[in-house]
Amino acid sequence: MINKKRLLLSTVSIMVISGWNQASAAVESQDSLVVTASRFKQPISSILAPYTVVTRDEIDRWQSNSVADILRRLPGVDIARHGGIGQLSSLFIRGTHASHVLVLMDGIRLNQAGISGSSDLSQIPVSLVQKIEYIRGPRSAVYGSDAIGGVINIITTREKLGTSLNVGIGSHGYQTYDGATQQTLAENTVLTAAANYTYTKGYDVVADGNTGGFRQPDRDGFMSKMLWLGVDQKFNEQVSGFVRAYGYNNRTSYDADINWSYPYARPDTRELYSRHYDMGVRFNQGIYSSQLITSYSHTKDYNFDPQYGRYDKSASLNDSEQYNLQWGNTFQLYQGIVSTGVDFQKQSIEAGTSYIPKSKTVRNTGMYLTAQQQLKDFILEGAIRSDKHSEAGWNTTWQASLGWEFIKDYRLIASYGTAFKAPTLSQMYGFGGNHDLKPEESKQWEGGIEGVTGQLTWRMTVYRNEIEQLIDYANSRYYNIGKAKIKGVEWTGLIDTGMFQHQLTIQYIDPRNSETNEILVRRAKQQVKYQLDWQLYDFDWGLTYQYLGRRYDKDFSTSPAKRVKLGGVSFWDLTVSYPVTSYLTIRARIANLLDKDYETVYGYRIPGREYYLTGSYNF
């Protein structure tokens, strides 16, 4: 965690040997090389911003069956869920809006975020996730629009040769079947293939009908099918490349929305079809490395009444295509690294998407420069980026950080950064659209101290985020009329005591509307997260505790919607696994152990106590 002497020199050595790779999750060494913070490979210990990595082994140990269940355990994260698996989930980082979180898949932003403004994590199959890199704080100076609260990078590439088969069952008719293999086709060629099918009957997610929709006392289930295929090729010692494709088809049932235009229909079914293709080439020689990636994704998102079908006039369709081109270069310079590159993105939507009457295309070109240097006991880090958005014009953001190891194993950190979010297509051209909207802008100050005290590795951070020109809906149109001010403090710690490993996060945020001084909705001011792991007689046990403080929401069953308070809650999860043989492992989980009844979105129930059983065979 703490910077050591010559840390950045070792970073450079590792990078030069391994090659810089933004989108590939190549085999990581024990010093946990990551790429998301500054778009070049570096050990976590050299990163000044708060950073968390979740590995596939941890996901298996937690036995998470959704991406939301993985992320809710992480520092600074708050999840507002409209029910169980597959139901809409909103991700808040450090109290910022869900649209202020940049979600990447293998370093490339998700397709639908440019339309709705935020990424719907509920639709990403958890079997697709092999690693998650998560950084808190502004990162627009590295990635451009959306990265106000933080960045989530979901990495899909598998890291281990071999084959794995998984079968699971659980409450509410849950079942999942998963298979993956990674094999060497030739000396320098590796093929990876994976598939998954997941289904749950679900449960009735609406608690009391207080959602402004129609009460439907039925099960709200979910089904997902996923395929992944990739090839990695090493051409020589300097050049390598990859090509991959993956896609998933999902079907989700929910309680009906009101369709004012076609009152005969009750849209309560969602079908999502997502396809993604990308390829890249990497070059590495001496102090220089480079990577070029191109990608294409296509998403179709239907909402309809099954009685009339998805092609009925009462149905809706969000149909979007996205093209990306990324070129990044990294240089060893003095006692550190400099990275520079260009991103290009083109997003096209068909007429009718998000109620936009005509097809639209937007383009964004970004140029960035990041650098990190070590000067004795100091680490200096900086980044600057300019984006040219075809609708929002030019936006330039920057950030700077300083770390000082004032005594051995203790470091002080200070940082400042700016960030922005461009208006979405629906805000500019949909119902109530305003093509004169300006980007939302933020300024964040952060200070922290981290250290190793005996067996305890810890960090405490305080931050302040001011966001202006927030886009809000008023008088039947979108305007830049909102402001928010967020203050927070978080403490994270990790310690081993005998056979027990403890991880603890304590966080407090004060997210307020600067105009009204009201607490922003669906954010808990206090959270405590605790993970306890231990091994006893070959059984691996895990106990998870989470406390969510009270939060506010809106009751949309009234007009105008009134503000309501949701109570706080504490809940536990228990997991256990046992290696029957060196190939076969059996895992079991009890989620919401004490069967707590609570809501993170007003009117939508979180599942009660649930049971899961999984078998994994690896060879």
Curated annotation (Swiss-Prot):
UniProt binding sites for Ca(2+) 1: 204, 216, 218, 220, 255
Signal peptide from the UniProt entry: 1-25
CDD domains to which the protein is assigned, alphabetical: ligand_gated_channel
Residue positions of motif TonB C-terminal box: 602-619
Motif, TonB box: chain positions: 31-38
Transmembrane portions of the chain: 163-170, 174-183, 189-200, 222-232, 237-253, 270-284, 286-303, 316-332, 335-344, 360-376, 378-388, 392-407, 410-424, 441-450, 456-465, 478-495, 499-514, 522-534, 540-556, 563-577, 590-601, 607-619
Cellular compartment(s): Cell outer membrane
PROSITE patterns from the UniProt entry: TONB_DEPENDENT_REC_1, TONB_DEPENDENT_REC_3
GO function term, MF aspect, one: ABC-type vitamin B12 transporter activity
Main location: membrane
Top-level division of the source organism's lineage: Bacteria
Domain named TBDR beta-barrel: residues: 160-619
GO terms (BP aspect): monoatomic ion transport
Membrane topology reported for the UniProt record: Multi-pass membrane protein
GO cellular component, one term: cell outer membrane
UniProt-annotated binding residues for cyanocob(III)alamin: 88, 90, 115-116, 256, 316, 522
Keywords: Calcium, Cell outer membrane, Ion transport, Membrane, Metal-binding, Porin, Signal, TonB box, Transmembrane, Transmembrane beta strand, Transport
Role played: Involved in the active translocation of vitamin B12 (cyanocobalamin) across the outer membrane to the periplasmic space. It derives its energy for transport by interacting with the trans-periplasmic membrane protein TonB.
HAMAP family for this protein: BtuB (MF_01531)
Family as reported in the entry's similarity comment: Belongs to the TonB-dependent receptor family. BtuB (TC 1.B.14.3.1) subfamily.
Protein name: Vitamin B12 transporter BtuB
